[in-house]
Amino acid sequence: PQITGKTASGQKWDISSWGDTFGNRSERYLAAVAYLDGARPSMVFARGYYTGPEGETGGRTVIATYDLVDGKLVKKWRFDTMDYNNQYIGQGNHSMSVADVDYDGCDELIYGSLAINNDGKPMYSTGLGHGDAQHVSDLDTSRPGLEVYSCHEETQAKYSFEMRDARTGEILVGGEQMGSDNGRGTSDDIDPRYPGCEGWSAAGILTAADGTVISTKYTMPANFLCYWDGDLGREVQDNIYISKWNPEKEKVETIFTASGCTSVNGTKANPSLTADLFGDWREEVMYPLKDGSALRIYTTTTPTSYKIPTLMHDIQYRMHVAYQNDC
């Protein structure tokens, strides 16, 4: 069908009490696309991820999913923390990840410290509460299945950052509570000396997938990632810079600067978009110009000897590109 940008259908929000109304904490919305039935994409909309750790009143999270049938939105299911107890309140992050964590052919939702099955039923909650960032992938290649790496704001949580089994919620690696808001966290393969993906956060600790501490000397940017040069490791993206981890010097070194551009999303300093747009598996980066007059897309000029199908053919990657466009 022709894409016009016109609204196809809509639903009114049911406005009610959402606990803590400090700032806009009760008005936090998320969206994603997920293959909940394993066959066709569904729309996922959510509200609420702050307040209400176990034993505290207030706070609410609702996730509603819809299919577009004959041009109309048809509700698939709705998850509401008011139907359960406090263990599911206040567990969300600034985005929800989409992945088939139990290998049943259908996507599940990783909602911060909470996981929701493709049928709308809760799978688990770690109870570690809200955090800004999370990454879901095969982070530890020595064990089956997917893992989640997440940082946490709650100082009463046991860990400031952790890596867990994405299906069961079992904590595999836990970072000591630092006593303050650990607001950034990132995980990917940046150090070729260690198998799997490394993890780092605002706590200033770089760990291997098995929990081995690689470095505590340097607080590395933990905002975003990018495949940019020709090797199979990931690069670190922060603000208008792309950098590469130097294991010998234990710091990142800038390899690209988007001159004349600016980042978006405040202190998160993101690009407008990072994705494999042109299909050679390295990723393009999109930034607004400083004067806001246009968007500029950059692509790498570095040759590579690796031939990999375009990343957009990986369904989890494609769904993640979609949900990265909300916060």
Predicted regions and their residues:
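Beta-propeller-forming repeat regions
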Residues: 1-327
